[in-house]
């Protein structure tokens, strides 16, 4: 199999780190992104990219095109979560959640698609969540961001089909990644007399299920199979 040029966002931890390493081990040319570090992970070349910043995205895409001449696969994995009651969410919390999880996907696709259309081939894999097919209490804006990714991906798949660009959705359930430890918590909800106790109890259940979830390598294996298939 000819090595593919693959770009994966959020590659410094969790699904992104495992998947980028697995794809690299299979002989692919893998570029990973992180907001903070450009230190390479073995054969995975890391680039500093903020998916909410179009300038940093364009700079990274330009570097890959300059070095490789193409991008065969884009894996939109970067994401974050804020736990709290929908009613008490601040405008900033909502903005951060949607900017990263939804508009980050939009920004990356818009940057890569011109090259895929020109090549008349390409593959975009968007990492959604079980939270993108059902609303999860106290994770409401996370769910909303993933529902948005679902609708966007389904529409995009139809629009770019004539250019031989495939768009795939992956909807993981509970996995033991660093997502649990990195989840932001709404202090307004935690301290609220009506929501607080219910929120903390819900959070305990979610965190227990995540810590007892599957190893992220299982999802990485599924993504590797999607990359390998001509028509996933």
What residues fall within each predicted segment?
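Substrate-binding pocket helix/loop in short-chain dehydrogenase/reductase
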Residues: 85-86, 90-95
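SDR active-site lid
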Residues: 162-232
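The beta1-alpha1 cofactor-binding region of Rossmann-like NAD(H)/NADP(H)-dependent oxidoreductases
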Residues: 49-59, 91-92
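Active-site helix of classical SDR
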Residues: 109, 145-148
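Conserved glycine-rich cofactor-binding loop
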Residues: 12-13
């Amino acid at each position: 199999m000819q090595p593919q040029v693959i770009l994966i966002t959020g590659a410094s931890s969790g699904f992104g780190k495992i998947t980028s390493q697995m794809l690299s081990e299979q002989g692919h040319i893998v570029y990973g992104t992180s907001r903070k570090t450009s230190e390479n992970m073995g054969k995975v070349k890391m680039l500093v990219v903020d998916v909410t910043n179009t300038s940093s995205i364009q700079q990274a895409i330009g570097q890959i095109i300059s070095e490789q001449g193409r991008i065969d696969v884009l894996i939109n994995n970067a994401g974050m979560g804020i736990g709290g009651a929908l009613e008490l969410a601040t405008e900033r919390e909502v903005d951060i959640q949607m900017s990263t999880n939804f508009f980050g996907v939009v920004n990356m696709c818009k940057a890569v698609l011109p090259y895929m259309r020109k090549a008349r081939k390409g593959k975009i894999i968007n990492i959604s969540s079980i939270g993108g097919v059902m609303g999860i209490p106290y994770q409401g804006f996370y769910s909303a961001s993933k529902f948005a990714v679902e609708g966007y991906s389904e529409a995009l798949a139809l629009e770019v089909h004539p250019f031989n660009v495939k768009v795939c959705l992956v909807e993981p359930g509970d996995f033991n990644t660093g997502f649990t430890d990195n989840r932001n918590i709404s202090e307004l909800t935690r301290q609220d007399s009506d929501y607080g106790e219910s929120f903390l109890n819900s959070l305990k259940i979610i965190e227990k299920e995540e810590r007892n979830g599957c190893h992220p390598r299982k999802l990485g294996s599924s993504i590797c199979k999607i990359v390998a298939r001509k028509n996933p």
